[in-house]
Amino acid sequence: MSNELLWFIVFLVDFSALLLFYKFLGKLGLFAWVAMATVIANIQVVKVISLFGVSATLGNVLYASIFLATAILSENYTKRDAALAALIGFVSMVALPVLMTLSLLFKPGADDFSQEALQTLFGVVPRVVGGSAVAYIVSQFHDVWSYHFIKSKKPGTKMLWLRNNGSTLVSQLLDSLIFATIAFYGLYPTRVFWEIVLTTYLLKAACALLDTPFIYLAKYLYTHGHVRER
């Protein structure tokens, strides 16, 4: 099975799972999804794959689903709920390397076989961790703000696609630029640096455009009383 086909399958699985979290757990399900997706995406990003002829990291699809989760909260609930979800994701993102770094400080036993693998996955690279954290918090809060700004200018279900795509496409660009600049600028030739920015953004932008039916489904579930709030 090709990586490209797997990418589309993963997209459908991730975004469908997000809707199931929402349908059966309501608003709390979206909060849980943001925390879970943030942690898993930051583990997946360690793996580099070839996708559509370019090198890319895993985690882009799951990371993009976080923006859909906050968009659903912005659309069906309040700006405060969306901002809270973004903050939950940020805390999860920061907690993961901190807690795993502490775990790695323990001296492994004679029969241990996991230390090297854990070091590979969770060994802290300050620029990468810092870049991820700054990019996440800036892009997420911009996403929440811009969604509500567009909603105030273009309300109504017919403009839902514009609110979702308009806010996310700009926010994902901010995310890609900030992360790549902090994590990689000066480490690679200028051409390679911009290739990283471009390919990362294009994958995230593709997810943003493809997730439009999912936010309409989330709106339908909410307005027709199919969401089980906890």
Kindly label every feature range from the protein language model.
Residues 87-110, 132, 136-140, 144:
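Transmembrane alpha-helix/helix-exit interface in multi-pass inner-membrane proteins
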